[in-house]
Amino acid sequence: MKLVIPKTVNIVELENAPFKCAKDADAWARSHGIVGLMSNVDTAGKGEVAISVHSLNKMLSGSALAKSSTPALHFAALMRLRDIIRESFVGEVHPDYIKVDGKRSPDNGINPLVEIWVLYGCASFADFPCRVKTTLKRFLDNNFPSKAYSYEISNIEILRGTVAPVARPSNKISMDVSILLNGVCDVNGVPLLDVCEIETVADGS
């Protein structure tokens, strides 16, 4: 069954981070409330999500930084990570494939205790839109919160008129999900827009 995803996603505004290296980013995140448990309300219905010190280590590793467009963009997203998780939607759900020789594959088997949720969201940095992909490890035993595992942020190109204000009083800006996910493939290499169903709104659009 196809995942139903929203028609639009709210854009999270980013600012330049006051740090330029992973060590300082780690210290800032620990002292500014990034680490800790997000409630179901905090995540806008995605369940509890834990952002741990181990999560930070993974998110600020060299390999994680390399997946984002620039380190500056990666650090800017860290400062708003909780907001990004809240405003993002679940775009993929798949098994936790076992890693062998540095690669995860269905051929290697799966971890039966965990499934992977991939969240997609939108941010704006220096007036340029960005796609944010956040990976959660969701424990199938509901007694444990999901674990924020990694995130990556990349610049995207859009056409004029593809962002629009959300109805007041939110005063937020949104992006059409069909634009956000254009060219994005799931873990199996299939375009996400082919395997997800965009929800309809009241006017049927």
Give the label of every model feature segment:
Residues M1-S205:
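Ribonuclease/tRNase effector modules and their secretory precursors
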